[in-house]
Amino acid sequence: MLAAITLGPTLYLLVTSLTPLSLVNPRTAYDFSDPTQNYRAAFVDPRFLNSVWVQVKLSIATVVLQLLVGLGVALLLNMRSRFLEAVRTAFLIPMVLPPIVVAIIWKIMYVTDVSPLHRALAFIGLPVSSLISNADTALWAIAAADTWEWFPFTMLMVLAALQMIPDEPIEAAKIDGAGRLQLFWYVLLPYIQPTLVVAGLFRLIDSVKAFPLIYVLTNGGPGTVTEVTNYYAFVQALNFSFWGYSSAIATLMVAGVLLLSWIIGRLGADRRLDD
């Protein structure tokens, strides 16, 4: 039963991707005369290929930023203190907010007429245009919002790894005269590196779900600068009624996510063997 509930919609998506289904002509739902036409069309569609490239850029930017910010915050909070325990809890707030709420918060931050960020910049003599309306900054603006929402995930994983490091190597390094940078690079980083890799892979998979941010902040614009693959599939289905083609795009995304999941599984298995 559970397998049917899980796999049923995915199988139906795959079946639909093999048809030229369009709401303009619903009878094509059972037309399997050319089952690969949508996939052939996707691989020569410049807009689809651009959406894949945009997704790659956004995923890399968000994963790198989330790892850096999460690591930095975890290092700052890696002390036993009641005050810091309260601070850690506060840092989790963005991660537990509904994605649409996060998107609305950042919409307010980026719209120049109401944005406290833009008003502060204008007050100190640094007025800037809307970050989400500028083709050069729109993708970075989305990456910043996604980082704010999800860096607590990396922070939690790294913090847990840091607190499992035994005291002996740290004390030995301090006795040998290691500075903070040397202590981090030669002692802490080797311990937490596997955690960073796993956290990065999990966030890489999850980065394909930035749809609410893009829908609320930019609608894929300016132009197609922030049009990632899942948003392009949405446009093909809801705006143009090309459900077969949209399903093919979604199926390709599922295949990519499954591949990344397999990589995570292999890394986890290799780590257990090493242990």
Residue ranges of model-derived segments:
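A structural signal for multi-pass alpha-helical bundles of membrane permease subunits
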Residues: 1-275
